Every structure is written in C-alpha cells, then in structure tokens.
Amino acid sequence: MKLSRKFVSDYIDINDDINTIAEKMTGVGNEYDSAGKLINASNLVIGEVLECDMHPDSDHLHVCKVNVGTEVLQIVCGAPNVRKGLKVIVALPGAELPGGTIKKGVIRGVESNGMLCSIAELGLDHKFLKEEDINGIHELPEVAPVGEDPIKYLELDDEVIDFELTSNRGDLLSILGMAYELGAIYDEKVNDIDLSHKEGIGNIKDELELKVDTEACPLFLARKVVNVTIKESPTFIKNRLIASGIRPINNVVDISNYVMLETGQPLHYYDADRLGSTLGVRMANDNEELTTLDNQKRTLSNSDIVIYNNTGAIGLAGIMGGLSTEVENDTKNIVIESAIFDPVLIRKTSKKVLRSEASNRFEKGLDPKRTYMAMERSLNLLEKYASATVVGGMLEHKNIDIKDKEIEIAYSKINKILGIELNKNTILDIFRKLDFTTLDKGDTVLVTVPSRRIDIAIEEDLVKEVGRIYGIDNIEGRKMILPVRMGKVDKTNRSIRHLLSNLGLSETLTYSLIKESEVHKYTNDTFDSIRLQDPMTEERSTLRYSLIPSLLSVYDYNTNRGNNNINLFEIGKSYYVKDNIHYEDEKLTILMSGTYYNKLGSNREVNYYITKGILEKVLNYLGYNNRYYYRKEDLPKELHPGVAASIYIDNKKVGIIGKIHPNVTKDNIFVIELNLSLLKDIKVSKMKYKEISKFPGISKDIAFVLDKNITSEEVIKTIKKAGGKLLTKIEVFDLYVDSSLGENNKSLAFSLYFEDPNKTLTLDEITEIFDRIAIDVEKKHNAKLRNN
C-alpha cells in the first residue's frame, strides 16, 4: 500500500517529516519498504523559450535561449516539440535527476547550460505517462510562472511511503484506514469524508431489477447516474493515483479507483444503456465463457462468482468486468456497483485469472459500512468532476450484520498479558485514540470496535491494540518467572534416559513417519494406521505404531558406513486408531547388535541375555522387581520364535524382547519395546531399602548343560530357591550351543553373588549353598554341571 502524504492530508494533518512518520508507523506494527519524495529531483525551474534556432551542425538539435527568471540561458535541446514561446521544465547545471547530474557542456561545438525536461526524465514510471510525455519535453501552460518550482506547480510535490502490510490489516488498504492509524499515533482527529450530492428525479428500481442467487454475495448495492461527461481527470486526482501506483485513464475510471484507494471498497461501473433490465449475482456454470475487459475469453468454473444480466454473465465479481458492458468514451449513463463477495472464492478466482488492487481488498474482507460510504463518495465525485446527475433510489441486497462489535475485557487481563501495570485512564485513552468507544464498568471495560477493524474479534485483539499504541519499545523486558514443574512422566523418562546412557547405550531421535507397509510389523495388535493425506514421499507417509522400524533404519545407516557395534534406545510416540478414536502411546525401544561393553571390563558379543539384562535393569529401576515375567506367546512373526518373549506385569502384556528373525535379516539384532503408557497404569511397588552390608560378598560362576527348550527364567527360579537369602544376585552371562554338548542341548552360565549382612561368609558356607544349587538344578531340569 502506497500512502500519499497529500492524499491522507485531506483527513489528518501531520507535520512530521516523511521518514519520522514511516518509523512511527513501523513502531505500531506497520513495516514500510521505502519513504521519500514522489519526484526525487532538485534544482528545477520553470523557463520560457525566448529563441529557438536550428543547431549549425545537426538536423535535429535546437539552440534555445531560455528565460529562467534570474537569467537567460543557452540550452541545446533535441526534443521535436521545442519551440519559441513554450513554457518548459528546466534542469539547471547541478540539478540531480534520476538519470544523473546535469552539468554545463558543449554539444557539437555549442555551449549548453542545462536541460529541458520531459516528465519521464523526472523519474515517473512510463506506465503513468502519455506518449508525448515520454518522447518530448513537457509543455507547461502559458500561465506557468517563470522561475518557480515546476514540481510544485504541477502538484507533484508529494511524498510517498510504501508499506508492507500484514494480511490481517485490510483496513489499512485505504487512505481513511491510514488516517485513523496515524490519528491513534499522533492523537489527532480524523476529518469526515464528503458524501454530499443532489438526489435526482426518477428511481433506479423502476428501470432495473436486482437478483442475488448466491450466499457468496452478502451485500450488493447499485445506483445510477446519467448525463456523464467523460474527460481528463482533475490534476489532483491524477497525481494522487500516480502516487498510489495507479495509472490515470479518464475522470470516470479514475474516480472509481480514487474511491477504492480512499475508502478501501472497490467499485465497478457499467454502461447503463448496455446493461438491460436485470442485474444479478450467481455462481458461474462449469465451462461458462466470459470475455473480460482485457478482451480475453475466460472459461469459468462453478467456484467463480459472476455478475449477470438478461443475456448472461457480464462480469467476474471482484476481479474484472465484462467487455459487453464496458464504460467507453461515449458512455452517458452509468450503473455503479458497490458490493462484498466471499473472500475465499475471490482469492481462488484471482489466482486463476488476475491479481489486482480490487481483488486484494476483497480477499482480506471488507467493512460493510464502507460499502455504503464508497457508493455515496462515488456519487459525490461523479457529480463534481463528471457533471453527473444522480438518479433516485438504490438497489440493495443485504444479508450481513453491519453492527459494530462489542468486547468486554478486564483491565487486569490487559496488564497481565502485556506484563506491565497501566492505569485505567491510560487504557481508556488508548482506546479513545483508536476511535473505539468505551464504557467503564469498574474492573472491566466494554469496548465498541468500529466495523472497519475486521481484524479485532476477541479480548486478546484488544490487548494487542493497547500494546501497539502504548509502544512495544516502552514495555520493559523482564525475566520470565513461570511456575513450571516437571511432570511425573517427564521425570520418569529422564531417569530412563540417564540409566540407559550409564549402561552404555546411545539415545537417538527418529522420524515419526515411516512406510505404510512397515506400520503393522513387530506387533500382533489390531488397529488402524494413520496415513497422511498428501505425503511428500512414500518413505514418510504413515505415522508409526512400533519404533522398531525406525531404529532399524538407524542401524542400516550405521552399518552401511562401517559401524557394526550399535546399542541404541529411543523414547517416542506411537500412533494408531481403534474404534474411530485416535490414540498416542509412549514407547521405549532398544536395539542392540555387535559388541557391548559389560561390567567385567571385556567386550562381549550382544546376545539375548545381555539384552534381557538391560530390560530388567529398566524394569527394576522403575519399581517392578519380581513382578515381571516372560511368555513365549503372542509374538510378532518378525522375531525369532526361539529367541523372543512377551513381557508381562500383573497379567498385562507391556512389551516384547527378542532377536530379529533370520528371514528379516541375517545380522544378530536384538530388540526390546516397552509400552511406557501401559506401565503408567500399573501401580509401582513401594521401594524397599536395605542396609548395605559392611561385610564383603563372594561371587561364583556356575554353568549347566541342559535341554535347549528350558528357559533361563526356569533355571533362575530354581537357583533362587536353593540359594536362599544369602544369594543376593543372579545374572546370566553366557549362552553356548555346540554339537559337543549334544544335539538338543545348550550351556547356560550364571554369575552368583553371596552376601551376609551380619558377617563374612566362610568358604564352607558358600560351598554348601553352591552344592545345593547344583543338585537342585540337576534334579529339576535334568541338567549336568559343566566343569569346563
């Protein structure tokens, strides 16, 4: 949005320089791209050509004697329209123009002391200019005063700020909106807009019928003027349009653009004599065709809004009118449209057809009061500058609330959100500056927000306004003091992370999105997966249920780069749908492969028992000692059936442990997956503490050869029972399978730790317990003690 200082001064007079105004607007949230003069040229004067002779050494150059008020200068000029008696724009030596600095010089042997200028050479964009303004010097009126500033005489002495507005501030896409914003900053009142005009005879309702057949047009107004004279616009209108970035065309077209810039409401004019007896609004038909003002045939869809008459579509609502009802130079009678259309549909159509100043305003939403205002302002200007006569009556379709919004808010809430202490009077004064009316109700204030501020709808919007006008720079920075406490789940997860890190595992963080084909792997659970509607790739198309596929991708990434010793864990979310309800579970997943450094100070190949030991460390740490057990049932097919188990606590399955099936990979990969969300629902046993023994313990190893179908868990139960209270710790540290042990046999080795809190154990005592353990295991499991 380009803000012309001269334009906005009709409504508010600000004495600050243009850069200060721009900075203050930025201070309340309205950033600008540039600020400066419309014509950035200096040392220019109005001159009169006293003599004009052909250059002695050129067939197109002229040697002119030019009166500039203080002296007569000789200037060589190549413009075809230069002649004696012409009033011209003279750039004196030292003048700064967009094309460079003007200096005294010699042109083909003749001295030249300046330059006679065209409007184009002053820096105006060619799109604003006529052909003669580009190809020849500018011809000033005969009454132009010699020696005066031509920029001021031409009323081009304007200043412009080019703003980069946020999408929510559609109200600032108007001079009036900018005036109200400046009024709030400078505490100045905004002048009223002139809407006066004479009411003529007759009534438009007797000539034209309005039909609105779609909810996409909540407000539509139409009025008529007759006996219009189409001619060049007054200078001030043309210059203000140029300053705003719009090319002047003629007085009628320029007035429609002028009113749009002034009020923010786009208008459209129809040639009334070509319109017919019906004016309506409807949705377009698929493949319907319309020739627009740019003489382009458009193929429409049923999401486009069209204006129509008895013959068919005559305009693309909010975008561009149709060629069949175009206002031309011989047009005498005009029907004026001022309306509001669905902003979403306008944006959709504008992206297909044309982005314009009008569509930009429709897309951001319009104030219905301005729709009426723009109509009246248009009649006012057409009457003044196009000699129009207004026809009585107005066609009106209204299905929209035009009331101002009322929002009640507590003073304390404003201060709490802003983090400052403003007294009641300061807050009320800020609302007054914004032209909001208020009703003080003690602890709260009822604020009536003008309908032009469509961006304000809730209490927090009012807080933002107070903060903006008070000044963000005036709000002192404070350290945030928040009563944040870490939740129980977060504490537990952090503790698990510390534990596993101390056990030598590395934490990883993987994508929650995986291939759809992997979602139902590593589980036998029944659920529906959650797929993205429009995934970027199939690799990241579906939210995961198990984290194992994610960790396997990390494993593949590492092994492909030569790292084969991988011990990872992740705590992350899993996602699924059951009975049309979406769920999220938190899971702990561990992957181990290659070499693992154990407590004995030696590197050992990862096996099931090392993995199981990590699992039990976690479960014991969480307080589930002696409550978990394993079952070789309900196992996913991706795990090796002989080296895997389901994990249970209190008859509830909480996870799985096992080796990845050889059909999936030949690598020895072991995984654990625990559903932490399920564990939260299982009451943790009260932690019991016992005094650390003052006396040393004794560690002994024992190994058995037994049937390979006997689990280590069964053997551990037997060892615990035989070992009694003095056996305080049991760990499986080796599994050995070899043909020398027998076809269906395996060797299990256990580390046993004995301790008495009251004394030092003797060798005889340990030997007695040790022998009892060996005998009981041999009897119960048909095992043999392995001696080597």
What are these regions (language model features)?
Residues 1-202, 335, 351-352, 357, ...:
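Phosphate-backbone binding interfaces of nucleic-acid-interacting proteins
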Residues 2, 433-439, 446, 455, ...:
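A carboxyl-terminal module marker
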Residues 5, 28, 62, 186, ...:
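Glycine/proline-enriched, intrinsically flexible loops and inter-domain linkers
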Residues 39-43, 199, 484-488, 510-528, ...:
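Beta-rich nucleic-acid/ligand-interaction surfaces
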Residues 46-76, 239, 243, 250, ...:
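Conserved mixed alpha/beta core segments that line enzyme active sites in large multi-domain catalysts
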Residues 111-123, 132-136, 305-406, 558, ...:
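Mobile "lid/hinge" segments at catalytic clefts and subdomain interfaces of large enzymes
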Residues 182, 186-211, 386-414:
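Terminal amphipathic helices with adjacent charged low-complexity linkers/tails
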Residues 407-564, 753-755, 765-788:
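Extended, well-folded interaction surfaces typified by the phenylalanyl-tRNA synthetase beta subunit core
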